[in-house]
Every structure is written in structure tokens, then in C-alpha cells.
């Protein structure tokens, strides 16, 4: 399965879904069309907001780093934060907010412990550029990179339950190696969590 299929399997039909850092709204559009969810996106980029609006996705322009107090406790069935947490100033605070707002949350992270990332850093002596980390260090929005172990330790520290987890290779697909030794062979990790 790929990441979109896993997300679809983790969300019930007609759920209320909030996507923090929704980008162009593509995943919300798929969920709305396939699962009849009530979808709301939060995005900071003007171009992405316009793309959401063109697709009929309800979207709020908001900087997640400035807080999410406009959302009540458990106000959504599911909150999605896909490849967003590493660009935020305070990932721990964001993770606590995600679990406060949603009954369940789906968080996807690029794994800085992925073997290609490690090898690239080791051999080149420079910050890696990979499929999941596609920009040079001075162009990237990523400021808090972590490994799978780092993220799972943070969940434990915050008393956040990991309900389910899936691991994906650099092509965005589940694989034997990614699932067998995820901190080394998974380029991307996806977690279903709650508090």
C-alpha cells in the first residue's frame, strides 16, 4: 500500500477531518470523494490555499507555529499532519495540539535515519538531498529532522499512544525491508496516535 491508501484505511466514512499543513488539499479531496468526509485544511502558503479553493476544499490560512487555540478539544474525528511536523518551530507542542484537537491523529514524518540519508551524509559530508528531503539545506523548510526512534520516544515522553504505525520505502510504498528494520530502511513513517 502507499501512504494515501493507508490514510484512507485509517479514517471512517463521514468523519470530520482536519489536515494541518494541507498543501494543495489533494489528500482532503481524495478523502472527501472516497469517504464522504467533512474536510477542513489549514495552510500558510497562498498558492496552495488557492489550489484548495479551486478544488472546493475548505481551507483556513493560518500559521501552525502561532498556535491552534481556535480549535476546541476533540473537535475533529481525525487530525492529519503529513510531513509537516519537521518544519515547525516546536514539534512537541504541535504534537500535543494535534492529539488535543483530534480523537485520533495521523502523523507522517520523513525518517532522517533512512540508510540513503545516512550514506549520503557519510560519503558527501554534506546535508543529504533525497526523495523525502528534496531540497538543499539552505532552501529547505525542515528545521527539526528526526528518526523513527526519535519520534516514538517523543510520543512516549508526551504519553501519546501509538495505535498503529506503517513504514514506507523511498518510493512511498510499504516493503519488507522498511517494515523489518524501519529506522534504517524506511524513508517515511506514518503513525496513528491518540492521547
Language-model region placement:
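Conserved alpha-helix/loop element of class I SAM-dependent methyltransferases that forms part
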Residues: 1-14
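Alpha-helix C-terminal capping/helix-to-coil transition sites in glycosyltransferase folds
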Residues: 13, 74-75, 101
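Class I SAM-dependent methyltransferase "Motif I" SAM/SAH-binding loop
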Residues: 21-23
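Class I SAM-dependent methyltransferase SAM/SAH-binding core
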Residues: 26, 30-67
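Short conserved loop adjoining the S-adenosyl-L-methionine
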Residues: 67-73
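A short SAM/SAH-binding and catalytic strip from SAM-dependent methyltransferases
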Residues: 80-89
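S-adenosyl-L-methionine-dependent methyltransferase catalytic module, highlighting the catalytic core
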Residues: 92-97, 104-194
Amino acid at each position: 500500500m502507499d501512504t494515501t491508501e493507508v490514510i484512507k484505511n485509517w479514517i471512517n466514512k463521514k468523519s470530520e477531518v482536519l489536515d494541518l499543513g494541507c498543501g494543495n488539499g489533494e489528500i482532503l479531496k481524495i478523502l472527501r470523494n472516497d469517504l464522504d468526509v467533512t474536510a477542513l485544511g489549514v495552510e500558510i502558503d497562498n498558492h496552495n490555499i488557492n489550489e484548495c479553493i479551486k478544488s472546493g476544499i475548505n481551507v483556513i490560512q493560518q500559521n501552525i507555529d502561532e498556535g491552534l487555540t481556535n480549535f476546541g478539544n476533540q473537535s475533529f474525528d481525525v487530525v492529519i499532519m503529513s510531513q509537516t511536523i519537521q518544519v515547525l518551530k516546536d514539534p512537541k507542542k504541535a504534537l500535543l495540539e494535534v492529539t488535543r484537537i483530534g480523537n485520533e491523529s495521523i502523523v507522517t514524518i520523513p525518517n532522517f535515519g533512512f540508510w540513503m540519508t545516512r550514506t549520503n551524509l557519510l560519503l558527501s559530508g554534506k546535508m543529504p538531498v533525497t526523495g523525502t528531503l528534496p531540497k538543499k539545506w539552505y532552501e529547505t523548510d525542515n528545521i527539526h529532522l528526526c528518526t523513527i526512534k526519535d519520534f516514538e520516544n517523543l510520543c512516549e515522553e508526551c504519553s501519546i499512544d501509538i495505535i498503529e504505525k506503517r513504514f514506507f520505502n523511498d518510493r512511498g510504498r510499504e516493503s519488507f525491508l522498511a517494515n523489518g528494520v524501519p529506522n534504517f530502511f524506511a524513508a517515511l513513517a506514518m503513525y496513528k496516535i491518540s492521547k
